[in-house]
Amino acid sequence: CIATEWLLEDVNINKEYSIREYFAGVGIQATLLQNMLNVKKHKVSDIDLECFNQLKEDKRWESFKEDGHKAILDNEYFDIKMLDFPHSSIIHLKRGKWSNFLGAFISKPEIVCWTDTSMTYSIKIHGSNYAKELNTNKLDSYSEYFQAMSDWLYNQVGYSLVKVAYRAKNAAYIKAIKGKHTLIEKSFPITKSNLGFKIL
């Protein structure tokens, strides 16, 4: 995914990284990470049996069939943690399907990336609900939404958002690191020629 590549383009390629993916699907993101980074350890998992069967065919990573949401609480240390949620918003992260989310930060990873799909709807539809969750008066744009999310995350675990990559109106890919940082945003339109992906 071109958006994910941009998120991690500033990672030190001369350093070895351990990577943990909790919702690895069929391994698209895992393949990208293997090609981008100097990987010393790579653990991937998915709850779906067909996805797991495909993942385990590639020996570049360790594959497990497990519930990624529960596995977040295992408190394993990895330099980079990837949470490619099939759907998510701040509501899911705080008190919904992915409410174990903050557990990903307990082991103090260098980088945590995740997917947010709230932008499939206009901010006018759910913005008031998101504003309540983030303890702010109102949200008029997704830029404001992610800035408020960054502030919330910093108050919770001492990490903040440094990059948000918008893949058209389908999803946002988020990168957080320790400390308080200025958020950088970039949009990646989907075209007929690449659909937001490139061949490796």
Task: Cite the ranges covered by each PLM segment.
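Rossmann-like AdoMet/SAM-dependent catalytic core
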Residues: 20, 144-200
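S-adenosyl-L-methionine
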Residues: 1-14, 29-31
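Conserved class I S-adenosyl-L-methionine
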Residues: 15-25
